[in-house]
Amino acid sequence: MKFNLVLASTSPFRQQLLQKLMLPFTCVNPDIDETPIKDETALALVKRLAEQKALAGANLIDETSVPQIIIGSDQVALINGQIIGKPYTVDNAIAQLSSASGQSITFYTGLAVFNNANQQMISCVEPFTVHFKHLSTAQIRYYVDAEQPLYCAGSFKCEGLGIALFNRLEGDDPNSLIGLPLIKLIDLLSQHGVDILSQAPECSIN
């Protein structure tokens, strides 16, 4: 199967993860409203936003004679029943990590794969739980100053120094924490007829 693969994200972290599959791909920036709907659950939110990003990405690319397969992804974290997102500021990051100290946080990553040739959307939500150590204020401040995780849900980068914050990780795919669960992605691509191992050499790039 020949296809063009598109990542509907400009996140360097998601790009680095997708590169592990050794498939050429292009990136587009889906500009969508990410405001939660009233009473929307974390699972419903990330699934909806992942699908909207994939559809928005499809609208940003030129039509071609080969199928375009667009990947959308979104992530939120849930602690004590409350959705938390990206901190954006140092103070917010410190507050998030202070709340997480000694607690368990579940991350929900919505993943959507859209084939514009047949208009088929396949999506799922992948959970992953991190169990935090009891952290002192000094440790939290040191970490935030060192790694500046201001654009990461939950205020940490597990691929870096953030790994020192945890007692235990619990889930099927640690890539979920970085924003793109590769095991599930491979499964969704296969449902679109894309076999990563046997068909990767046949794919093309815009």
From Swiss-Prot:
Catalysed reactions, as listed in the record: N(7)-methyl-GTP + H2O = N(7)-methyl-GMP + diphosphate + H(+)
Q: What does the record give as the active site?
A: 74
Task: Tell me the keywords, alphabetical order.
Answer: Cytoplasm, Hydrolase, Nucleotide metabolism
Q: What is its EC number?
A: 3.6.1.-
Query: Which InterPro entries does this UniProt record tie to the protein?
Result: ITPase-like_fam, Maf-like
Question: Per the record, a Pfam family?
Answer: Maf
**What EC class is this?**
hydrolase
- Origin, by domain of life? Bacteria
Primary residence: cytoplasm
Report the cofactors.
a divalent metal cation
Q: Among the entry's GO cellular component annotations, what is one?
A: cytoplasm
- Site feature Important for substrate specificity, where: 13, 75, 159
HAMAP family according to UniProt: Maf
Provide the family line.
Belongs to the Maf family. YceF subfamily.
Known role: Nucleoside triphosphate pyrophosphatase that hydrolyzes 7-methyl-GTP (m(7)GTP). May have a dual role in cell division arrest and in preventing the incorporation of modified nucleotides into cellular nucleic acids.
The protein's name is 7-methyl-GTP pyrophosphatase
What is the species of this protein? Answer: Shewanella frigidimarina (strain NCIMB 400)
